[in-house]
Each structure stands twice: as C-alpha cells, then as structure tokens.
A protein has these predicted regions:
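N-terminal Rossmann-fold NAD(P) dinucleotide-binding loop
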Residues: 15-16
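Glycine-rich FAD pyrophosphate-binding loop
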Residues: 7, 20-43
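FAD/FMN-dependent oxidoreductases across multiple families
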Residues: 118-121, 218-295
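C-terminal helical "tail/cap" subdomain of flavin- and related membrane-associated enzymes
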Residues: 297-374
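N-terminal FAD cofactor-binding segment of flavoenzymes
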Residues: 36-75
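Beta1/beta-strand and adjacent pyrophosphate-binding region of the FAD-binding site
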Residues: 1-12
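Dinucleotide-binding Rossmann-like beta1-alpha1 core, especially the glycine-rich loop
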Residues: 47, 53, 79-101
Length: 374
C-alpha cells in the first residue's frame, strides 16, 4: 500500500491547480485520472484574463504551439431574431482547446500522477481512504467533474434528483473550404439564447477550429433544440454545411441550483464535482481554478481533516460565489426580472448585451482575480 497525505481524483483544471498549489506545502500528493493526457474534452473552451492571471500563465508563452484565440467582440441574440454585436476594444477573453489547456496545466504538476487509471473502489479504513486497494490517504479530494466517484461519498451523490445542465457540442478542425464558408469570426464568439431562456447555444471559432454547442436544463428537448439551431446557423452561413462526426454530450450543475455537500470527514469536492459552474453562463473553468486554490489554503492550514476542520472551505466558497439558493428557481440563465416578453427586447439592446450579458454574466469583470495565500 502506498501512503499519501492526500489523493486528488481528477486531473483537469481543478485537480491540477490544487496539486500545483500544494507543491511546496510538504504534503505528499497523488493525482489520479481515468484518462491519459492529452485527452479529448468536450467544452466550448474560453478563459478570461482573470484565469490567466490567477494561474500565472503568460499568453504569449502559452500560444506557442497551442491555440489561443484573443476575443474582443461578442455577437449575442435570441434564436429567431437578429443578433447584436458589441466591440469591447481590448482582449476580454481567450479561446482555448481543452485538450491542450488541461495538458498544459497538468504538465506543470510535479507531484506523482497515476493516469489512465479509473477509480474502481474507495473504501474507508482506520480513518483513511483506500483507493483501488493500492493507495491510501487521510484526505481525498474529488476533482473528477460532474460524475466524480468521490462525489458519491457525500450526501445522495450524483443522480436524477439533481437539476443538471445537459450540453451537446462538437469541435473540429475546418478544411480550407469549410473555413471560407464559415462567417463566424475567431475574435467574436456568438451566443444565441433559447426563447424560453432555459439555455443557450454558441458558435466559437478558434483559428481553424470550430466549436458548436447548446446547453439546457431540460435535456429531454436538447437534441431538438440543437438540431434546429444548427440548421438555422447553416442557412445563414454562420457555420459550414458539412459538419463532421457526432455531437458529444456532457453534464454539469449550476452553482445556485446545486445541493452537493462540499466537505465531510476526510473528503472535499472542488470544481464541477462540487457543482460550482456560474449560474448565468455555465462557465466552469474559473470556479474550478478558484475552488482549488481555496481548498489548498484550507488544507495547508488544517490541523486535521475532520469535517469541522474542513468547513472553512465551504465558508470560503460561499463568500466567493455567494450563498446557494434554498429554493432553485425554474429559470436557468437569467434572473426572474429578465423574462419574456421583456427578454426579446433586451436581447436587441447593445447596452444590455454588452454590460449585463457579456461583461457581468459571462466575463465576470466586476469580480477581481482571486488572491489566496497557499
């Protein structure tokens, strides 16, 4: 049996950030993931300058040999009506490919890594957690996304009782013919809101790569909404006529609608495993990074790994992201005051789509980069 101070399950942005943050803590850390890296990852894939700053990533250095698409404009509309385009002037976000971004973050981790290793068992034994009958630690951190096996240890775990966002998307490298037929521009992601405001679709070009997808909180209608959106985008020339391959599905919880416990004795959840995606946009990368850094701060200071000692992590999450709603409302993307028929007019407004939808809901420009002492 190999002993560690903590085991991190999941080597995505949350897990790799936590491992890196604990590098000089003196703790022996193991990070486990079911896949090898680099690996395919379904995600629209954009990160704000705040994320780059928090992770100390130099955009110029990162862009060498990797896709990094500067974003200066957004094109936003409601399905079935004309879009509004806003120019923000400066670079307000970056497009990345998750297969590259996640591999880059993991490459900066110097702790032991056990990749291509599915977690088949997690057993409590003498105050420690034993994973796959091979590795043992007093603390296990779930960073494995929505269906993280560690999340099953807390509360009711992942399941049908949760109100999840279901998304389908595809990302592919365009041929020269496809690229010339695609009106979507790299520096201008397109966001298209469903008319019932229970989701939105996107068209995001990153150099020669194109990402198209749609996410909703009622997945039984997801395929129909997606097919209608794709046909509309094809008919207007926003995307090429010939799309390769199948759309891939994934799921996640919005912060205000999630009810997962964040800690228990010897257990913590971070990132999508904890249900931290921003409620208005569904973005999970920044909450994943920040939750990992907040967790590292608590782990570094904790005298033991009891639930009471780890509860300060839950308090820090509430302080950073707000208190979760006790009764989740029925709307997904938007507050109650933005409802039809008002929404149709608001989505035609340059001020609203720029100041509220883009800068507040999607870019979170009013929230400064996280500063923690780890």
């Amino acid at each position: 049996m190999d002993y560690y101070d903590l085991i991190i399950v999941g080597a995505g942005p949350a897990g790799s950030t936590l491992a890196s943050a604990l590098e000089n803590s003196g703790k022996k850390v193991l990070i486990i993931d079911k896949q090898n890296f680099p690996r395919d990852k379904t995600c629209a894939g954009w990160v704000t300058p705040a994320v780059m700053e928090t992770l100390s990533i130099d955009p110029e250095e990162y862009s060498r040999g990797r896709t990094l698409q500067p974003i200066r404009r957004f094109r936003i509309g409601m399905m079935g009506q004309p879009a509004v385009e806003n120019d923000h002037g400066d670079v307000v976000s970056y497009g990345i490919r998750r297969c590259e971004f996640d591999d880059y973050l993991l490459s900066r981790v110097n702790n032991p890594k056990q990749l291509a290793t599915p977690v088949k068992s997690i057993v409590r034994k003498d105050g420690n957690w034993v994973v796959n009958d091979t590795w043992e630690a007093p603390l296990i951190v779930g960073a494995g996304g929505h269906f993280c096996p560690v999340a099953r240890l807390l509360g009711d775990g992942p399941g049908g009782h949760e109100t999840v966002v279901a998304a389908k998307e595809v990302e592919f490298e365009m041929t020269p013919d496809q690229a010339s037929a695609c009106l979507a521009r790299g520096d201008t992601p397109e966001l298209w809101f469903c008319r019932d405001l229970k989701g939105y679709a996107w068209v995001f070009r990153k150099g020669n790569f194109l990402n198209i997808g749609l996410g909703r909180e009622d997945n039984h209608k997801l395929t129909g909404h997606l097919e209608a959106f794709v046909e509309e985008m094809k008919s207007t020339g926003r995307i090429p006529q010939d799309l390769p391959g199948r759309f891939k599905g994934h799921a996640y919880l919005l912060y205000a609608h999630a009810d997962r416990p964040l800690v228990d004795d010897g257990v913590m959840l971070i990132g999508d495993a904890a249900g931290l995606a921003y409620t208005q946009s569904g973005e999970g990368i920044r909450p994943a990074i920040e939750s990992a850094l907040l967790a590292a701060d608590v782990i570094g200071e904790a005298t033991d790994y009891s639930a009471s000692s780890l509860q300060s992590y839950g308090d820090a999450i509430a302080e950073r992201f707000g208190t979760r709603a006790s009764e989740p409302d029925q709307g997904w993307q938007v507050p109650d005051w933005v409802k039809m028929p008002l929404a149709s007019s608001l989505m035609r407004s340059h001020w609203f789509t720029r100041k509220v939808v883009t800068e507040k809901w999607f870019l979170h420009q009013e929230v400064p980069p996280l500063k923690v002492a780890v």
